[in-house]
């Protein structure tokens, strides 16, 4: 314990006085003293700075290279040169410093004073350190609060009892307030011997630690006074008040806990105390004073306690904790005080707050010249439960604080040692630093708290890598022949230190989890390509197993940790080219078998001798056979059957695969063949005898094989690694296929080889059953019920593609070819736009600077369809789709049905042999599934109507299904139904029935996309041609014209041209006499045709001219000849005026219809139509004369005003021109001024200047209308 945080102080007892028989020394590495569970404790503070390579963790744990080797008992006092012993008064000294150094044990000098110049005690060096065994390691108890270690050493300062005087050593004072240490005197009555350090101690001594041991039990006299002077003291005095060990608190203070009954004359004086805590265990009185000038106090009554606090400065706090007293008087004063005051408060009121250390009463020292007294009165009787709870809470709090500090200190030390080990070179061994660090770590393993699993694994990994990565001892000796002997000794010492560390870590946590954290890091090293690394790993594993067998502290109910991996790796080493490694590996397996057997016998409550059991098992497993080690492997696998569960079988197989990695690179040909043989024997025997136990771990085995194949390059080794697939598939094909479906997509070479292994190697599975499983997977939706994407269908398609690459499988695939084809086509539709979970397989052949191609599921599915067609001999069909772009159409959402139709049409054209099977298979499919399923099936089914065999199908399955499709809510189903009916109409016996359905077919085209309308109308033309003039009801034609007219303005050129062309052909089908419906429909077509002619698209314009001629011919219109001209109207104002005058004069009843259509086209998204409509409006309105109303004129005004700000400049100019024409016509015809209309101005005001240009007509503003239009257009562009 320390007087301040960071001090390194141990209190030693005086050998000449009455020693305490229960004192407990600090156990050292070579200490012969066994610690006993007594309250006497060795004290050391937590570290605050980084430790050196060999830090002064603890006087007993610090290897001292300069000290004399050999065990030292702490019970023997140190002597000086003259042989004088320490006097009755001992001394406690602490001085803080910011540096570290070596720790020495201070002995008394000739004058009887302990000083740093004394001869240091003998401490064992690091080279002679022994690992602490469980029998001699210290254990924490309720009073033990100092199990931590420290590397901090302290310098010495002069005593200064007067607070007003300056410090003689300013440097030490500047270190920290808590580092200023006063003199500590323990004196007897009548014999006051001060134990002070020399005042002239230099700063060089700051690097040495002074350790002395004092026992307060040296005062048998009842009148003895104990005086302690310190800057910060935390004293805890319990029921027994004489022999007290001292411990550091959580804040670097001192706790004193008495161990025997108090004497009647005991006086305790504490001066310069900042924190005082007293916990009496009985009602016996205690008196505690803190004053620099007050003499020894007398014993107070049991009902009261007096505490006088004297601070060194006005800012220092004084706090205390007292229990089991009825009256508490507190006084805090300073010398030269001018005012004193006393305060009293009952303790019972604050007992609830005293449940933690937060309840400590703190007195702030008043300024100089003032004093304050406080009296606290407590009830005579206190509740015993409250007292017990208070004491328990305080002890618990102190323990928690100490545990936290110890944990942090241990973690910091472990990390520092690990860094030191990591800094050691991996190619040479010239320093004992690595060994010393591991020895320190081994010693730390005996302290609490224990390391976590993650920390232990990290520690073992660091140490193992640092030692195992070293070259062989022969190589290191050859590199430095002059130090060959030293290197050899240091090498074996390092290996021994590592093994002791591993054993110590197991002792620290002797549980299955703790054993697993040690064995796991060792495992991969047994498969190293270097013999010396394998030998070290095998030796360490065997040593840990041997230590486990000797200790065996636990009963493994869930099986030995990592049994499968450990057994598998040791089995591989039996076949190692180095016979010594094989022999030691077999011995390790024998120990492992003995452990398992012993656990089994212990569970059955059978008494067994470990040594005899080991010898019997050694004979039972047989001697090592270097000629044929595979015999040993087979024997071991057979005998371990009772201990192998599913997890162990999995680990055995994966361990066998580990032995196949890197054979060609790291080992010779013979060695590689031996390892392959050992792995193959292991795999074959385990799968032959225990494959039924691997059923539940098949997915994990498949995943392990996939991962290991990436590291196995040698062809023969890859064949061995793939053996478990064919073995397991022969018995559990469904489970194996399901596991293979989880391989990352797209399949790389490893995944593809695993699929092909199902049928390439014996024993192989039934291909028929395998294909049926894949077909079942292909029928699943790639989206689960919860909306999550599933890779199962795509994985099944990928597996099918790999199986098709095996020629022997093609014949079996033909059996279910129709089902596979339809299932794949439906999956193509499902995978359009589908984002699957990211399970991309890393491409080992891809370069770092090249991005792998983006994996799009639908394209991969289309590729599988193409592969299936080619394997089934449909190369012509595949080429046809390639030419027509059918594969691209098939992978798009809006055109998927077109790609499927192209494929079916090609198969019909090239007379595919499987069409009849597909036709009969499709009939039930039309009633199943969702919309995508039905669309794909219907698209294929409709094209099969071209076959002659369709006549055999009942009419309800052909014509009936198509009639139902006409009323389907999906437009694509409507189009497909129309196509099916048109194809059926080619059959003479079906023509009449299909023609009767023409009105329903036309009606189904309403509200349909333009492209679908064009496609459907293209099919309907066949019926119109075949019908001729037989159709007497013109309503069908009129309805067709109504459906086509809205698509005249479609954004797609092909749709516009097709609809306009069909419109003209339908008009030709019309017969006289004209009905009102016909006239209204054709009249509503006039303006659109005139505007579209001005579009500027030659192809569309030509279709419009033809259609306009057809309409004019049927309606007897006499339009001006230039109305059919495609020349722009920009410079043809007279032509537009003639057309408008003709329309007003000849179609007076429809003039407002024409105006409304013009205003509607003025809002069209295409600029060409807006410009044509504006030009037409500018000529039509003046021709209407008095027909215009105010409401209509305002509507025209608003439309033109908006168009003056159109993004298209030509539209702005045309809008301004139209305004000028309309205004000029109004003034010329002397239109009356409309009320409240500022747009039409008085002609008389046109010749006067008005500052408000906004109210003037456009033609009378200072700028011309062209400039105004251009300015408006520019403003609109800026916006």
From Swiss-Prot:
Biased composition (Low complexity): 39-61
Domain of life assignment: Eukaryota
Subcellular location: Membrane
Primary site of residence: membrane
Keyword Glycoprotein: yes
Sequence intervals crossing the membrane: 548-568, 722-742
Keyword terms of this UniProt record: Glycoprotein, Membrane, Phosphoprotein, Repeat, Transmembrane, Transmembrane helix
Bilayer topology: Multi-pass membrane protein
Residue spans of the HEAT repeats: 913-950, 992-1029, 1035-1072, 1080-1117
Bias kind Polar residues: ranges: 71-106, 124-140
Glycosylation sites: 200, 210, 255, 267, 296, 541
Region of interest (Disordered), ranges: 1-145
Statement: the UniProt record of this protein carries the keyword Repeat: yes
Any one cellular-component term (Gene Ontology): membrane
Phosphoserine, modified sites: 356
Record InterPro entries: ARM-like, ARM-type_fold, HEAT_Maestro, HEAT_MROH2B-like, Maestro-like_HEAT, Maestro_heat-like_prot
Matches recorded under SUPFAM superfamilies: ARM repeat (SSF48371)
PANTHER family registered for this protein in UniProt: MAESTRO HEAT-LIKE REPEAT-CONTAINING PROTEIN FAMILY MEMBER 7 (PTHR23120:SF17), MAESTRO-RELATED HEAT DOMAIN-CONTAINING (PTHR23120)
Name this protein carries in UniProt: Maestro heat-like repeat-containing protein family member 7
UniProt source species: Mus musculus (Mouse)
């Amino acid at each position: 314990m320390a007087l301040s945080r960071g001090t390194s102080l141990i209190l030693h007892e005086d050998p000449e006085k009455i020693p305490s028989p229960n004192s407990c020394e600090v156990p050292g590495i070579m200490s012969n003293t066994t610690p006993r569970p007594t309250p006497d404790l060795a004290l050391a503070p937590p570290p605050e700075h980084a430790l050196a390579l060999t830090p002064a963790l603890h006087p007993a744990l610090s290897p001292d290279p300069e000290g004399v080797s050999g065990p030292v008992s702490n019970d023997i006092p140190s002597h000086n040169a003259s042989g004088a012993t320490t006097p009755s008064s001992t001394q406690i000294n602490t001085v803080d410093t910011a540096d570290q150094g070596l720790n020495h044990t201070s002995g008394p000098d000739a004058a009887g004073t302990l000083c740093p110049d004394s001869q240091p005690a003998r401490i064992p060096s690091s080279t002679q350190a022994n690992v602490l065994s469980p029998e001699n390691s210290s254990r924490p108890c309720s009073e033990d609060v100092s199990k931590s270690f420290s590397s901090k050493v302290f310098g010495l300062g002069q005593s200064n009892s007067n607070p007003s005087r300056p410090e003689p050593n300013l440097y030490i004072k500047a270190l920290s307030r808590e580092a200023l240490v006063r003199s500590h005197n323990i004196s007897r009555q009548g014999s006051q011997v001060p134990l002070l350090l020399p005042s002239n101690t230099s700063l060089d001594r700051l690097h040495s630690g002074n350790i002395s041991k004092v026992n307060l039990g040296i005062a048998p006299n009842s009148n003895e006074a104990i005086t302690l002077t310190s800057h910060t003291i935390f004293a805890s005095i319990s029921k027994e008040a004489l022999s007290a060990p001292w411990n550091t608190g959580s804040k670097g203070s001192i706790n004193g806990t008495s161990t025997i009954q108090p004497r009647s004359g005991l006086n305790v004086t504490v001066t310069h105390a900042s924190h005082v805590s007293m916990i009496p265990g009985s009602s016996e009185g205690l008196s505690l004073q803190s004053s620099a000038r007050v003499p020894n106090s007398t014993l107070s009554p049991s009902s009261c306690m007096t505490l006088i606090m004297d601070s060194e400065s006005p800012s220092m706090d004084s706090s205390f904790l007292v229990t089991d007293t009825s009256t508490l008087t507190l006084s805090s004063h300073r010398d030269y005080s001018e005012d004193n005051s006393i305060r009293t408060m009952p303790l019972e009121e604050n007992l609830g707050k005293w449940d933690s250390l937060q309840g400590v009463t703190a007195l702030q020292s008043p300024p100089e010249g003032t004093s304050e007294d406080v009296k606290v009165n407590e009830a005579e009787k206190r509740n015993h439960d409250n007292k017990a709870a208070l004491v328990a809470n305080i002890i618990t709090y102190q323990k928690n604080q100490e545990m936290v500090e110890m944990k942090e200190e241990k973690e910091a030390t472990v990390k520092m040692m690990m860094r030191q080990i990591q800094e050691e070179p991996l190619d040479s061994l010239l320093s004992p630093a690595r060994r010393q660090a591991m020895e320190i770590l081994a010693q730390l393993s005996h302290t609490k708290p224990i390391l976590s699993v993650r920390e232990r694994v990290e520690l073992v990994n660091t140490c193992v890598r640092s030692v195992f990565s070293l070259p062989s001892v022969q190589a290191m000796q050859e590199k430095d022949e002059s130090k060959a002997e030293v290197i050899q000794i240091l090498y074996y010492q390092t290996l021994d230190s590592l093994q002791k560390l591993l054993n110590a870590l197991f002792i620290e946590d002797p549980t299955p989890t703790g054993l697993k954290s040690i064995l796991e890091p060792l495992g991969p090293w047994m498969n190293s390509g270097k013999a010396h690394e394998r030998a070290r790993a095998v030796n360490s594993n065997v040593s840990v197993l041997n230590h486990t067998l000797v200790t065996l502290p636990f009963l493994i109910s869930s099986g030995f940790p990592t049994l499968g991996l450990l057994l598998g790796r040791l089995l591989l080493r039996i076949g190692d080219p180095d016979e010594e490694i094989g022999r030691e590996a077999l011995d390790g397996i024998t120990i492992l078998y003995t452990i398992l057997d012993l656990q089994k016998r212990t569970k059955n409550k059978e008494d067994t001798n470990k040594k005899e059991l080991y010898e019997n098992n050694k004979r039972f497993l047989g001697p090592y056979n270097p000629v044929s080690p595979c015999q040993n492997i087979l024997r071991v696998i057979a005998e371990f059957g009772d201990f192998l569960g599913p997890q162990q079988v999995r680990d055995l197989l994966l361990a066998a695969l580990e032995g196949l990695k890197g054979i060609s690179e790291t080992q010779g040909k013979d060695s590689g063949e031996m390892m392959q043989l050992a792995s193959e024997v292991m795999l074959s025997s385990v799968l032959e005898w225990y494959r039924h136990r691997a059923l539940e771990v098949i997915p994990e085995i498949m995943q392990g094989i996939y991962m290991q194949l990436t590291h196995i390059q040698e062809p023969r080794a890859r064949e061995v690694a793939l053996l478990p697939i064919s073995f397991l598939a022969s018995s559990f094909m469904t489970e194996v296929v399901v596991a293979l479906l989880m391989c990352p997509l797209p399949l790389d070479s490893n995944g593809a080889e695993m699929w092909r292994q199902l049928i390439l190697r014996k024993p192989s599975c039934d291909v028929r059953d395998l294909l049926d499983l894949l077909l079942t997977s292909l029928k699943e939706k790639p989206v689960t019920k919860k909306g999550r994407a599933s890779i199962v269908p795509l994985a099944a398609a990928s597996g099918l593609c790999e199986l098709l690459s095996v020629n022997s499988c093609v014949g079996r695939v033909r059996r279910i070819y129709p089902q596979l084809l339809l299932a794949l086509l439906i999956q193509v539709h499902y995978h359009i736009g589908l984002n699957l979970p990211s399970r991309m397989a890393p491409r080992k052949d891809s370069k770092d600077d090249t991005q792998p191609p983006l994996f799009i599921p639908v394209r991969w599915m289309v590729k599988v369809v193409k592969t299936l067609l080619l394997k089934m001999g449909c190369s012509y069909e595949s080429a046809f789709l390639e030419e027509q772009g059918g594969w691209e159409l098939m992978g798009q959402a809006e055109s998927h049905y077109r790609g499927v139709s192209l494929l079916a049409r090609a198969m019909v054209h090239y007379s595919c042999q499987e069409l009849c099977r597909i036709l009969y298979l499709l009939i039930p499919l039309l009633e199943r599934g969702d919309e995508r399923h039905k669309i794909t099936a219907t698209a294929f089914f409709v094209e099969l109507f071209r076959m002659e065999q369709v006549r055999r199908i009942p009419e309800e399955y052909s014509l009936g299904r198509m009639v139902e499709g006409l009323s389907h809510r999906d437009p694509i189903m409507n189009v497909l139904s129309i196509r099916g009916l048109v194809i059926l109409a080619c059959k003479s016996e079906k023509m009449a029935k299909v023609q009767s359905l023409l009105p329903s077919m036309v009606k189904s085209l309403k509200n349909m996309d333009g492209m679908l309308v064009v496609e459907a109308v293209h099919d309907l033309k066949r019926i119109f041609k075949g019908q001729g003039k037989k159709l007497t009801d013109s309503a069908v034609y009129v309805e067709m014209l109504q459906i086509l007219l809205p698509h005249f303005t479609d954004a797609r050129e092909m749709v516009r041209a097709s609809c306009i062309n069909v419109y003209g052909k339908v008009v030709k089908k019309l017969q006289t006499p004209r009905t009102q419906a016909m006239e209204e429909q054709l009249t509503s077509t006039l303006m659109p045709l005139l505007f579209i002619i001005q579009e500027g698209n030659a192809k569309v314009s030509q279709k419009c001219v033809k259609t306009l001629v057809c309409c004019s011919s049927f309606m007897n219109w006499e339009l001006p000849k230039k109305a059919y001209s495609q020349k722009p109207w920009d410079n043809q104002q007279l032509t537009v005026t003639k057309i408008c005058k003709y329309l007003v004069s000849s179609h007076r009843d429809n003039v407002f219809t024409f105006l409304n259509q013009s205003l509607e086209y003025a809002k069209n998204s295409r600029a060409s139509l807006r410009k044509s409509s504006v030009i037409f409006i500018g000529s039509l309105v003046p021709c209407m004369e008095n027909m215009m109303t105010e409401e209509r004129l305002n509507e025209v005004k608003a439309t033109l005003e908006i168009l003056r700000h159109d993004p298209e400049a030509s539209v702005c100019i045309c809008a301004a021109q139209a305004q000028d024409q309309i205004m000029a016509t109004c003034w010329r015809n002397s239109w009356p001024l409309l009320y409240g209309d500022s747009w039409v101005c008085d002609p008389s005001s046109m010749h006067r200047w008005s500052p408000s240009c906004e109210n003037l007509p456009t033609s009378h503003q200072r700028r011309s209308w062209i400039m105004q239009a251009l300015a408006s257009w520019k403003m609109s562009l800026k916006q």
